[in-house]
């Protein structure tokens, strides 16, 4: 004879109040997969504790459960046509459980990395284990749950081997069935909070098969040869390769017009004016003197040519006056290397230039072009070589002697003026004849 199902009595009003209170204290589910198992397990526990056979009370309890779920989740799962907790639970698990396959979660649990901190390592491993077990509990597949629990238990040994050597040797002989037992054992031995500063985790890139590997894109992947950046120019390009030009400062007295002009080496010592028009050069500087090489006075060699036309004022004293002003003559007959004649007044009586003046102007002319050809000695301050305190000179005594000398000179001049000449001796002067005139 079959047994009739037991009739579940309805709940009292006080029990209904307690059910509403406990469901209201459950954390509201907002769609987080990590909190789904906690929410579902709490609701299952409350419904198992306050079971009722009254349909009216069941609808009231179901209304409290719906209010503990966010409206967005309810719209997503379409819970408007659901009237029991089993239907709602099935849709929540189907839509919000971890979608990662179980075997992938198990592999992530086994490969939990150890980064030196024992506690952080075990907490991360426990979090990954709970993710897998929570999914197995939500799916309610007994066979699959039993299978994966055995694999989790066998994976504890791989986690223990990742611990430092001194910790592994102390816990190797203990029976550790699960991860919670390992945590409790390390807490008892005082090794749960240890931090290993020498990490056993070895980075793979330090032991790469290609130590010469470069992360630059300009690398030949076949033979691992570095290719340096080169200009994009084909071998059969009609455009020839042009070397960069060397620039120098043009010789001009105006500091506002010191733009670079191209300089080409001149090995034959021939005057070659620049053929390139400089758009930045003003028109009045087209005929300016360019001291690249000398055309006249070729008998004097050039020893150290200053190609930058720079004059070191600190080394050679004062800078000489430049004599390369533009001539007022016709540009066709203008010779830039000719010395400029110094003008003289008309009544000077000198119509030409002396040889010394000509050579002096030549020296001044070449000095502006090649300042290192001729060396001259600047005026030194002799106080550096003869200090003032080396000879103690009495200035007062020296002045007194000088004054006495001047007074003596004045006294001698006065005596000479007062002395009268001997007129008598001058009037009676007779020349004396020689005794022997034949001599």
Swiss-Prot record:
Which segments carry the region annotation Disordered? 203-224, 243-353, 412-439
Q: Where in the cell is it found?
A: Virion
Q: Organism, per UniProt?
A: Drosophila melanogaster (Fruit fly)
Task: Please give the name of this protein.
Answer: Retrovirus-related Gag polyprotein from copia-like transposable element 17.6
Regions of compositional bias (Low complexity) in chain numbering? 313-333
What keywords would UniProt list here? Transposable element, Virion
- List where Polar residues composition bias occurs: 245-255, 266-312
- Main location (coarse class): virion
């Amino acid at each position: 004879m079959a047994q009739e199902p037991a009739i579940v009595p309805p709940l009292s009003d006080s029990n209904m109040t307690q059910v509403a209170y406990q469901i209201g204290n459950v954390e509201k589910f907002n769609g987080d997969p990590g909190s789904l198992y906690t929410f579902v397990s709490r609701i299952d526990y409350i419904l198992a504790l306050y079971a009722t056979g009254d349909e009216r009370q069941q609808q009231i309890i179901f209304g409290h459960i719906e209010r503990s779920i966010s409206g967005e989740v309810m719209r997503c799962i379409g819970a408007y046509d659901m009237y029991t907790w089993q239907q709602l639970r099935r849709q929540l698990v189907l839509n919000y459980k971890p979608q990662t396959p179980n075997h992938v979660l198990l592999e992530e649990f086994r490969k939990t990395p150890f980064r030196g901190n024992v506690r952080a390592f075990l907490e991360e491993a426990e979090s990954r284990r709970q993710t897998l077990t929570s999914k197995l509990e939500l799916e309610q597949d007994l066979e699959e749950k039993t299978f994966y629990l055995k694999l989790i238990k066998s994976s504890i040994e791989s986690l223990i081997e990742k611990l430092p050597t001194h910790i592994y040797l102390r816990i190797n002989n203990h029976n550790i069935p699960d991860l919670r037992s390992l945590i409790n054992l390390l807490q008892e031995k005082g090794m749960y909070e240890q931090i290993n500063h020498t990490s056993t985790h070895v980075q793979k890139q330090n032991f790469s098969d290609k130590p010469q590997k470069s992360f630059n894109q300009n690398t030949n992947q076949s033979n691992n040869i570095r290719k340096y950046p080169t200009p994009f120019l084909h071998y059969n390009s009609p455009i020839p390769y042009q070397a960069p030009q060397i620039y120098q400062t043009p010789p001009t007295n105006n500091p506002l017009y010191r733009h670079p002009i191209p300089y080409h080496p001149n090995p034959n010592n021939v005057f070659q004016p620049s053929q390139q028009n400089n758009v930045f050069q003003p028109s009045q500087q087209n005929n300016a003197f360019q001291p690249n090489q000398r055309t006249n006075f070729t008998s004097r060699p050039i020893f150290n040519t200053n190609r930058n036309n720079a004059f070191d004022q600190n080394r050679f004293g004062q800078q000489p006056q430049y004599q390369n002003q533009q001539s007022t003559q016709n540009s066709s007959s203008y010779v830039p290397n000719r010395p400029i004649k110094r003008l003289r007044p008309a009544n000077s009586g000198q119509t030409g230039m002396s040889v010394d003046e000509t050579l002096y102007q030549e020296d001044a002319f070449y000095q502006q072009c090649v300042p290192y050809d001729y060396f001259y000695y600047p005026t030194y301050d002799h106080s550096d070589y003869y200090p003032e305190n080396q000879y103690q000179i009495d200035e007062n005594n020296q002045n007194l002697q000088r004054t006495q000398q001047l007074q003596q000179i004045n006294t001698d001049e006065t005596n000479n003026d007062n002395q009268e000449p001997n007129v008598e001796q001058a009037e009676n002067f007779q020349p004396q004849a020689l005794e022997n005139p034949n001599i």
